[in-house]
Curated annotation (Swiss-Prot):
Catalyzes the ATP-dependent conversion of 7-carboxy-7-deazaguanine (CDG) to 7-cyano-7-deazaguanine (preQ(0)). HAMAP family: QueC. This is 7-cyano-7-deazaguanine synthase. Its cofactor is Zn(2+). Pathway: Purine metabolism; 7-cyano-7-deazaguanine biosynthesis. InterPro entries: QueC, Rossmann-like_a/b/a_fold. Keywords: ATP-binding, Ligase, Metal-binding, Nucleotide-binding, Queuosine biosynthesis, Zinc. It catalyses: 7-carboxy-7-deazaguanine + NH4(+) + ATP = 7-cyano-7-deazaguanine + ADP + phosphate + H2O + H(+). Binds 1 zinc ion per subunit. SUPFAM superfamilies: Adenine nucleotide alpha hydrolases-like. The lineage of its organism: Bacteria, Bacillati, Cyanobacteriota, Cyanophyceae, Oscillatoriophycideae. Its EC number is 6.3.4.20. It comes from Gloeothece citriformis (strain PCC 7424) (Cyanothece sp. (strain PCC 7424)). The gene is queC. ATP binds at L10, S11, G12, G13, L14, D15, S16, A17, T18, T19, A20. GO terms for biological process: queuosine biosynthetic process.
């Protein structure tokens, strides 16, 4: 029997790297897909390349989809300052990139169908996240219906399953799963900024640092994150 294939949306961050390791542990032949969308830096793409090597993923596609041409987010528009953590959790932050996950999953669906993959693995998380609307379970359910209706394989009665194994995990749970699966956490990149070292102050850094410290791995957190935890 042929080994099943899965496309992994690999950003280079902790969640997507852990998701890739889960797909491999589930018996899939992984096809990694990394997308540069015009964000402030290439750190994530560089991290994705390291993760692919460490996890032994043989097929890796990197594409550019430059959403910075129209901006609309602090991550794609240099004129908008990246906010520090601690914003109103009930508001969608300016770091939300309009339509990003919809664009990403659509491209992953194209790749999956072309490669005969049975699944698309996503590092989406709806617990410890920044309030993005395209990280919710109901969003994934809606996109699954779209995938079934818009693909040749779907019309033929089969499906390319969207799998988000971390969607209901806390960030602490994700850290612990990453450690168990041998994910190179130190090689992942979550910071919104593109400096030599993570800033430790943006929302993404703060969520990550708190989880690393709570899970018992403070040495993997930023120095700022360790100081703020006291």
């Amino acid at each position: 029997m042929n080994q099943p294939k899965a496309v992994i949306l690999l950003s280079g961050g902790l969640d997507s790297a852990t998701t890739a390791a889960i797909a491999l542990a589930s018996g899939y032949e992984a096809i990694a897909l990394s997308l540069f969308y015009g964000q402030r830096h290439h750190k994530e793409i560089e991290a994705a390349q390291k993760i692919v090597q460490v996890l032994g993923i043989k097929e890796h596609y990197s594409l550019e989809v430059n959403l910075s041409q129209w901006g609309g987010s602090a991550l794609t528009d240099q004129s908008i300052e990246v906010p520090k953590a601690g914003l109103n959790p009930h508001l969608i932050p300016i770091t939300y990139v309009p339509g990003r996950n919809t664009v990403f999953i659509a491209i992953a669906l194209s790749l999956a169908e072309a490669k005969g993959a049975q699944a698309i693995y996503l590092g989406i998380n709806a617990i410890d996240y920044s309030g993005y609307p395209d990280c919710r379970p109901e969003y994934l359910e809606a996109f699954q219906k779209l995938a079934n209706l818009s693909s040749k394989i779907g019309v033929e009665g089969k499906t390319i399953q969207l799998i988000a194994p971390l969607v209901k995990d806390s960030k602490v749970d994700i850290v612990r799963r990453a450690v168990r699966l041998g994910v190179p956490i130190a090689d992942t990149w979550s910071c919104y900024q593109g400096e030599d070292e993570p800033c430790g102050l943006c929302d993404s850094c703060r969520i990550r640092d708190r989880a690393l410290i709570e899970a018992g791995y403070p040495e993997l957190a930023t120095e700022i994150g360790r100081k703020l935890s006291h």
